[in-house]
Amino acid sequence: MSEKRQFLKEFNTLDYILRSAKNILIVAHSNPDPDAVGSTVALGSFVKKFYKARIVMGCYDPFPDTLSDIIPDVTFENPDELDLTLFDVVIGCDSVERGFDRVIDNVSEDCVTIAIDHHHDITLQSDVRIIDGLYAATCEILYDFFIFTHKQFDKKIATALLVGIIGDTGAFQHANTSAEILTMSADLIKRGASITKIIATLSASQEIETLNLWGRALGRTKFYKENGLAVSAITREDLQGHLVNSGEISNVASMLATVPLVRAALVVYQADDNTIKGSLRAEKHGNIDVSAIAHTLGGGGHKLASGFSIPGQIIGVDDNGWKIV
């Protein structure tokens, strides 16, 4: 079984860069989810506390109001309104291909670019890459970095990290919840993070549009008893007026994978007019390596969580079913 990378060399490099930097921009992906918010705020707060650089936290969308009670007094600056050439370091945290790509196209030539992510399919190039799909959340990677530096971080940083971890593990219900995650979360609670307040806030923050999207996907799910596969589809019509977050799609697959008799779940969605993306999820008891399925379709990932992208369209979504052409 594959093991997570330790990133000792990369952490040394990151620490050196942070100590040398003067102006740092940390970027959360568009339509930021809890892991994007948590990782951006945690790293920004950590640098402010322990390094000398000026910090700006950026995102093409505003800081989510739903998280302002547990992560107060934070503002995201729109990168379009910043002079990006003033930054000597820019860092993308989580789903870096959803916004960070636009930033690094407009920085100065000598700017150092850093990508920190736990998504397996990141192709974006940067000067420093701290990316491993075996981590449950980008906040988990940052926790390891903070521990690596031997700096004693506070309640605010611990809270931001736990927000991301709880968000991407589905409050410890998804298959990516490991013993390491639970030990890490216990440490964050010791540092002052309130697990009950975070879970209550995240549970209450699901938008009606998101719940409706999940409902449509769950309503057209098909179960293939012969192999234990649950399959569903999300169309362009489903997504009209809804800025899709890939995490929302993954959450549908994760929920389906927990249903009794389901060994693995696949949710496909129309990413654009001619591209279909798929999210594969499994639980350990299913004994299915979904990365093998993803690899046959040109994708990747790991045993319990993988994804792929293929050309095509989802058509005929009605009572008679749907198909990909």
Report each predicted region and the residues it spans.
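Hydrophobic helix-and-loop "lid/oligomerization" segment in the mid-to-C-terminal part
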Residues: 2-31, 36-68, 83-87, 167-296, ...
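Glycine-rich, phosphate-binding/catalytic loops in enzymes
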Residues: 43-44, 107-110, 131-132, 183
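Active-site cofactor/cluster-binding pocket
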Residues: 69, 74-128
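Solvent-exposed alpha-helices and their adjacent loops that cap or buttress functional pockets
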Residues: 82-85, 105-108, 122-123, 153-155, ...
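Short alpha-helices
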Residues: 116-184
